[in-house]
Amino acid sequence: DKTLPIYLGVLPRNGKGEDIRWFKAPNQNACHVINAFNVGTKIHFDIPVSKGNGLWFFPDVDGSPFSPPDAMAFPTRWTVDYASKSDEFESVKKLSDMGGEFPRIDDRHLSREHRFAWWLVIDLSKPFTASAGRGMNALGYMDYQTGRQTSWWAGEQYHMQEPCFVPRTPTSPEGDGYIVVVVDNVVTNLSQLVILDAQSVDKGPIARIKVPFRLR
């Protein structure tokens, strides 16, 4: 229902039900989460957000058809202030023009402020094999500190599955490691396990493990 606002519930980690705060913002759609952390009483939620319904199997209450352009999600930061007397979001800030989903960070920084993020990108500027459709054909990278953003395109016959970050060593600095992602070839119906340097995804894979069947 596009006429209704969205609501975000915030409950202190050791709080009780009566401690929950509900914040609202104009209608938008969100699904997967990059990360969330607080700085003092302000809580930041980094999340891919789309203008309209991102899930075609949920019908619109007014019968409107599914709109692919409105379903494109972009990394966005929602900020609320738990100490505020207002029930409105403090801010909604778009973080990148690379639209996509299935984000990932260095999991060692979950619930703490993070510097790097990776996500699957739908790169509409690249060619695609008709049978593949407009799938998630690229891997995006963002450095929050420097503002650097880049991506790796898998190729016109490929779709990607959800990525995973692997630290180079248990004590490596944040973001020092590898992105591991399954890439599906829609023509051969086979998969590859692709490994990229997490800080240089634009340089392409450093290894490919070819699987003699399609995963999933």
Residue ranges and their predicted role:
Residues 1-216:
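Beta-propeller domains
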